[in-house]
Amino acid sequence: MIYDLFCNFAPMKQCCLIILMICSLTVSAQQERTWEEVWQEMMTPEDMDETEETWEDYYERLQQLADHPIDLNHTNREDLEQLPFLSAQQVMDIMEYLDRYRPMRSMNELKMVRSLDYQQIALLPFFVYVGEVVREEPHFPSLQNITKYGKHTVMATGHVPFYERKGDQDGYLGYRYRHSLRYEFTYGNYVKAGIIGAQDAGEPFFANQNNTGYDTYSYYIQLKKLGILENAVIGKYKIGAGLGLVLNTSFKLGKLATLQNMGRQPNTLRAHSSRSEGDYFQGAAAIIRLCKPLTLTTFASYRPIDATLNDDGTASTMITSGYHRTIKEMEKKHNTHLSAFGGSIGYRQGGFHLGANAVYSSIDRTLCPNTKTTYRRYYPQGDNFLNTSLDYGYTHYRFAINGETALNKDGALATINTLSIQASGDLSLVAIQRFYSYRYNGLYAHGFGNTTRTQNESGIYLGVTWQPLAHLHLQGYADYAYSPWPRYQVSQASHTWDMLLQSTLKWQKWSLQARHRTRLQQKDDDNKNMLIPSNEHRTRLSIAHTSDAGWTSKTQADYVYTVYKEVSQGWMVSQQTGYQHATWQASLSLGYFDTDSYASRIYLYERQLQHEFTFPSYYGNGLRLALYAQVSLNDHLRLATRLGYTNYFDRSSIGTGLQEIAQSHTTDLDLQLRWKF
């Protein structure tokens, strides 16, 4: 048994350190990293406690782009703007290069675009490619060609836990296994259609008030370049406008990732192809090209949602977790309906753009949050909501100015304005100013800020990316925010500072990265009479090495120090090793952690199955082990599996409530089979 190997605490510490040292000394690296490994260097996973669904959606979008990369020899500005890690200047520079030198012959030509830094150069090959120079179809393809030459993908994924939670024995309506099934059909960049069925562990399957099989389904048909119809989706979809003050169900990037796209908000209409049950529309949407500089975007949606109800039948809160495992959770399933319609009209000429946006939504139960709690007083209330805005901007090859100013139906104001400067090929700067009135609210507003709510915040963000030497890359930001109205755990006006500095040194096959982040916040004391500091410091050091032999290796050390009422600190050391062959690949992740409490938890990236997003955190004292393997059985079939094992040395049980596991260790197995034809 795996457990027998790790049952003793003291020997395990020595064993972990020995294994980590051996791995770091003996393993080289891989032929090519995955896009997930590059992407996680741009993440601040500690923000995911409040924005996990946003990060999951970001991951799913990148996965879709990786599955259907963009042909640089047959692309346009709108296609490149789908890539959320590119700034407006970088999109412009790539298009100018293509206009001058297309057709491209090699991906190495991207190095000629000076505004692209090493992270974009590392990410782009996963999402774009240099295709053959062939004449594009002069019009939308015929139904005969679509059905004859279209590509099909079927993917089945299952999660098997080798343990039982308390709810699996009594409390959950379903079994402990999690699984999903997805089908997608594509024809070039013209047609995409699919359906996804998914359920979480504990949810019933063809049983207990769930007669449709999976707990949740997503379905869509997307058409592009159909005459004046640039993009259209029927089914479930996501859409954005401006900088997200009125409408953004698509992206909300973290502050570190903002340094990559220089504050640009990627506003695209796209199919909702993930298992997430939050922030999507259901109905139809379209982008229509009225004339070359003028586009019209319109949408309509009607969808069921989960809600917590008050005694009088009104809705207290809208729930987006998507869990329907217990009788109480099942009673809340789709007990309320939300409708919405709206759109935007945009003008773009040269580098200038101007847009007007409006969203109207209504709910069939009056929304009545508990406003006796002061910080909820200005949460959305009522049964209908209206938000309008103007977005504006100008893009030059050296700088870009963008902004959006919005009003809700009560006249409350929200505004955000960005300035990004490409001072040289080695230096870029970004500044973001925001003011969100504490009376402003919007059901679909997700603007840049400290929290998930675009409300009760004003601040300034300053970021810099600098490459002082050929092999040295520096990034940093400082963000200050002021909240004049009480927030959760904050009973009066408060201030927040968030600062990060990251350096990356690359030399031949080696990469050394150091990161430090400090967050200085204010929260209530025990008596809620005054605010006291709530500070957090996170430091990470990592070293990676690559070689042409197919191996990969990365050694990482994390340290966390937090202060709020009491001091909590912790550390973790981890090693990731991988090998990539022409038809198969495998990776091993091993980590040892020792933290005082949940406040000093540490996040660890692990290789995941396709379309499965997790970024687990660990606290206490224990060991984490994960093994990933993938093999191409033939040109059409691919099998992937992941085995995870966690052993805690400081407790006899894991979790609380119905999630409690009556043992100190867990083992999980994930399986995935993909069939493309």
Predicted regions mapped to residue ranges:
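Amphipathic, charged-and-aliphatic alpha-helical interface segments
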Residues: W55-M107, L124-Y129, Q199, E203
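Cleaved targeting-peptide boundary
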Residues: Q30-V38
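Exposed, low-structure sequence patches enriched in small/polar residues
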Residues: Y172-R176, F281, T336-P369, R377-F677
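Outer membrane beta-barrel
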Residues: T212-D306, L427-N441, Q585-Y598
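Outer-membrane beta-barrel proteins
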Residues: A198-T216, R270-E277, E331-H334, A406-N408, ...
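Alpha-helical interaction/regulatory segments in DNA maintenance proteins
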Residues: D49-Q63, M92, R100-P103, K111-K148, ...
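Hydrophobic h-region of N-terminal signal peptides that target proteins for export
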Residues: L20-S28
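Transmembrane beta-strand segments of Gram-negative outer membrane beta-barrel proteins
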Residues: P141-Q169, F185, N189-I195, A232, ...
